[in-house]
Amino acid sequence: MRVLVTGGAGFIGSHVVDRLLADGHAVDVIDNLATGRRERVPGAVRLHVCDLRDARLDAVVAAAQPGTVVHVAAQAAVSRSVADPRFDASVNVLGTIALLEVCRRAGVRRVVYTSTGGAAYGDTDVLPTPEDHPLRPASPYGVSKTTAERYLECWAGLTGGRALTLRLANVYGPRQDPAGEAGVIAIFSSRLLAGDPCLVNGDGEQTRDYVYASDVANAVARAVASPDVAGVANIGTGAETTVNELYRRLARLTGVSRAAEHGPARPGEQRRSVLDATRAKALLGWTATVSLDEGLMKTVTWFQEELRA
């Protein structure tokens, strides 16, 4: 099958591309390279350097002729969404609308969308949180990603297409940007290996559900291989880990005895987040297979190799 991946030069998108290629699919990538890297795109893949809001998008999709579109491209920083909600909405909402309109004109019948899990549900006492829990996003990022979900549902209803939203937990692994604010594991790994202090926002007892990048790529690949599966499915491990515990594990792996520093909590960030992925197992046969300890070891090893390069 021909698959078009938006954001395929980025952290999550590049892992998705690798998995789709391994499964034998022909892959095209759209990426504006704002945060993605050209060198992450394999030679067997056609890279179209294009923003989803660009007028050239019609021609790019027409050239790719995809049977399925996997929409990963996004503005993913919560803090930037708080500082500049208009930009966040422009990328995550208007960019998605533009893509869906082009898909409609090109006759694309299948879209798989990677949305957010924790930022969608906000603070909740129902943990792990299932898909039918009310959406209570506490940040513009959560609002924009869940709004895009609604447009995807509308596109499917109007065109007869099949749309599947995967609400991702906190994704981590090789290739994550340690200079960004969305990946605490990448940030801690990079700084610990460099001998720099690490800053924990708030008291560090906030929890997250950390899911390894290859597990996420596997979920997307299963979605591509299951064209009749529609709706929404959480992609997470079902396990909560505090930021303090995360730091302790990474400090042990890197041989660092220094304690983390603490700063103020970030606006728009929820206290606890962990996803119920029962539906993903039922619909896609998917469960996370990489444990946190294994994933952290692989991630630290990758950052060590990057430092040597």
What positions do the PLM features span?
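Residue-level signature of the cytosolic catalytic core of signaling kinases
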Residues: 41, 53, 177-181, 239, ...
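C-terminal substrate-binding subdomain of Rossmann-fold SDR/epimerase-dehydratase oxidoreductases
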Residues: 190-309
